[in-house]
């Protein structure tokens, strides 16, 4: 699903209920108020390369700007050119409004320091791809707590389904052993936690049997990327995460709708130059 990730402390300070904000137009007065009252928050809303305003639109990329909208009642499951849709035009107009009113960084489309701006306290919120506990996971990178609010329905798109897949290289000299390792990574909790969090006492400390705390100066570089490795249902919870996270994730996945193109992967070999 998609929605807002935002600074929990700022929302509480100004009594902002992000659950009541479902559109960019509803968000705009909040951004202006924060810009006026929080001098350090130069960019009340921000985004990285995959979290631009059109991320709230209900579509899935097929190839380049060729997309299929989830709203099949309106688009009938046809492939359309994203940049020719009225929804895309509205997203561009809204981004332009933010730019003209000084609510986003002037070089937002080329800037690469999105996380650093958030870490420096210059940003209140951004569009994000959400799941239960996502904000808590992301908060581990910062000195403040993030919260989240869902805007869209839950969709099981192809990108989410293949984004963390692991495969055996066709050039592997020992494919059977690689496959055995991948099987263990997805079934053995000890191995999964070793790969994802490192060594107990060195890279993390146990609080209880299934919860750990990670020091700020950890040298283990997978912090924040555990969702990519193995089976997330086997992993420890980190301090502050809900003990119900695993069950919430399973319920979240079960509720997800599948778009009309689910399981389809476009082979662009014949039109690679055109795309």
Regions found by a protein language model. Name each.
Residues 1-275:
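Extracytoplasmic/secretory soluble proteins
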């Amino acid at each position: 699903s998609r929605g807002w990730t935002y600074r929990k402390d700022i929302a509480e300070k100004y009594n902002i209920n992000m659950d009541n904000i479902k559109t960019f137009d509803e968000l705009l007065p909040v951004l202006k108020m924060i810009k006026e009252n929080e001098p350090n928050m130069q960019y009340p809303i921000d985004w990285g390369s995959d979290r631009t305003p059109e991320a709230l639109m209900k579509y899935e990329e097929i190839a380049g700007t060729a997309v299929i909208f989830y709203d099949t009642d309106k688009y009938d499951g046809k492939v359309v050119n994203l940049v020719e849709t009225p929804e895309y035009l509205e997203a561009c107009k809204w981004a332009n409004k933010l730019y003209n009113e000084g609510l986003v960084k002037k070089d937002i489309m080329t800037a690469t320091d999105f996380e650093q701006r958030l870490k420096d306290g210059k940003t209140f919120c951004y569009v994000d791809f959400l799941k239960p506990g996502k904000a808590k996971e992301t908060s581990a990178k910062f000195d403040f707590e993030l919260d989240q609010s869902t805007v869209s329905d839950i969709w099981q798109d192809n990108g989410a389904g293949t984004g963390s897949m692991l495969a055996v290289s066709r050039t592997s000299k020992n494919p059977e052993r690689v496959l055995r390792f991948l099987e263990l990574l997805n079934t053995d909790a000890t191995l999964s936690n070793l790969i994802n969090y490192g060594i107990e006492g060195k890279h993390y400390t146990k609080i209880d049997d299934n919860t750990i705390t990670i020091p700020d100066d950890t040298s283990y570089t997978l912090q924040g990327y555990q969702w990519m490795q193995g089976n997330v249902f086997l992993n420890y919870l980190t301090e502050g995460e809900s003990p119900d996270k695993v069950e919430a994730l399973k319920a979240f996945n079960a509720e997800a709708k599948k778009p009309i193109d689910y399981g389809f992967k476009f082979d662009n070999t014949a039109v690679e130059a055109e795309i």
